[in-house]
Amino acid sequence: MKKPLNSAEEKKTGDITKAEIEAIKSGLHSNPFALLGVHETPEGFSARCFIPGAEEVSVLTLDGNFVGELKQIDPDGFFEGRIDLSKRQPVRYRACRDDAEWAVTDPYSFGPVLGPMDDYFVREGSHLRLFDRMGAHPLKLEGVEGFHFAVWAPNARRVSVVGDFNNWDGRRHVMRFRKDTGIWEIFAPDVYAGCAYKFEILGANGELLPLKADPYARRGELRPKNASVTAPELTQKWEDQAHREHWAQVDQRRQPISIYEVHAGSWQRREDGTFLSWDELAAQLIPYCTDMGFTHIEFLPITEHPYDPSWGYQTTGLYAPTARFGDPEGFARFVNGAHKVGIGVLLDWVPAHFPTDEHGLRWFDGTALYEHADPRQGFHPDWNTAIYNFGRIEVMSYLINNALYWAEKFHLDGLRVDAVASMLYLDYSRKEGEWIPNEYGGRENLESVRFLQKMNSLVYGTHPGVMTIAEESTSWPKVSQPVHEGGLGFGFKWNMGFMHDTLSYFSREPVHRKFHHQELTFGLLYAFTENFVLPLSHDEVVHGKGSLIAKMSGDDWQKFANLRSYYGFMWGYPGKKLLFMGQEFAQWSEWSEKGSLDWNLRQYPMHEGMRRLVRDLNLTYRSKAALHARDCEPDGFRWLVVDDHENSVFAWLRTAPGEKPVAVICNLTPVYRENYYVPLPVAGRWREILNTDAEIYGGSGKGNGGRVQAVDAGGEIGAMLVLPPLATIMLEPEN
């Protein structure tokens, strides 16, 4: 316990006590702005500074005029004295020691940057541009270049910004506390872009916390380092007006959307095994997706994260594109390049939880600030991570502003929101007694619901054309319905039931499929209850599950035929499409983030055939309105053959107003069938627009010679078809 100051120790040096000097020197003073810098006195102006290592200090105006010499009042570098100024203004100190001389622009002689309106909007949770005010931003203040820093730490006793620019000394740039909001801020003159920095925080109980990265940092160091980095504002010259206007004007549910899911660190690598830069990715990935016919690229999280095997899902920097692939400007160039050729860019976004790394958000100011204090609410047992406190206004604002930031600054086309089910249920992955009911005694996380509704409302309200997609694995109602109709407000939802049932079916031996016919028909009972995306994602090809081709039943020929028929089934089925990288050419091995995809497989005809099929499926899906314009509406689907269990044959019709219908027929046993009758809506010639058994795709080349004749036999219209083995065909009327 500290000894109380006696009267001798309280003796003043000028207007400052020895105790105050000691508090500044030891980093325990919470408001150095009251002591340091330029101050007006009855006799004029005086200046005080703390410059460790200095023996002499003189004071200059910013334009270099000498205005006074300061007296050393403490040998550790404390100086004060009268200065010749006519008005209060920032000053620069010239410090000397032996033969060394250096200049220090006084951060304590500048006023605050944030204003009362910032405080007002922060308090009520309606500040929608926090990304321009919080964190580190370049600023020219009173003619001086520097960076403004701001961080939320309401329970801290003291917060300093430390970095390369002050030798990581927490006594040099102690921040100003705005008590109405709990935000600390400082303008640090002469700090330039590219400096590593963190926040040094003295907790509520006086304990010095581990140095914290900036929650709003727009750039970070490459792992294993974990400091934030001062970054210039983005100056990307955007050339994507046509792309953005298109998506802002259309009904996304009626557009073809085919998503290529990519892990940026392992799609391709350089020959030495290092990551491609954003510019290298742009030069290879964008043309590849254009050729393949995908409409969107969806990246697994590219926000800063310390641990490669987390794939980015345990992020410590929601506002910073990871340094693994270069600077943020590189990512902006990638998005711009994709938009110029009409490809959208989606980001996998993780607002459900955050890792407990000591430099991150956990226990940020010495209290449970971003997370719940009670582990029954604030700890995720599946991932050993912390759960955001969605009921706290500042936390909700942090996350919502992040969603807006990616749309605003990087022109992203949408966010796929990870682990929504874990956000919606208080008892998610918890046993009895391990969770706290809501105010009505239920298991629904009402705070999370309000957060998701507000996030979606603001994203769609401020950025027309941007979409949000929920990864939600339960039957929570109205996930993709508007908020004003009682929904969560997402644009789309992943159809996990489709993925589970269809993978189960196609992994079965064909001889057993007749007993599991409902696995492919049941999904149509709920296919239009949400706006669905059909996901064959990274989750299905990791953790011992095997790749998609490896999941298929049978010998190698049957595996390829099964996967081709499965892709044909999926691209003909109502819903938007998503396919994880490597599965388009039937990579045999499971995905690993440690290296590139097995691109060498493309030299083999069966693998190259699979890639050609996916390409042609995308082009067919995009060019035939019947296959996409009613993906989310029941009037665009009709069964033609639904109950042929014995032969494992399925057929349905896809339609759109004013467009030619497309019939999709799947023969899911290895039996070649001739003269198989399928009812069709109109008589006449129907063209075979796609056949997954074509030789060009690696199939046996069986089919209908390019067309069939539908005849009207007494009011019943249909055609006798050849059904290739383990294949999907698509037909379209010629007229």
Curated annotation (Swiss-Prot):
SUPFAM superfamilies: (Trans)glycosidases, E set domains, Glycosyl hydrolase domain. Disulfide bonds: none annotated. Its EC number is 2.4.1.18. HAMAP family: GlgB (MF_00685). Monomer. PANTHER family: 1,4-ALPHA-GLUCAN-BRANCHING ENZYME. This is 1,4-alpha-glucan branching enzyme GlgB. The lineage of its organism: Bacteria, Pseudomonadati, Pseudomonadota, Alphaproteobacteria, Hyphomicrobiales.
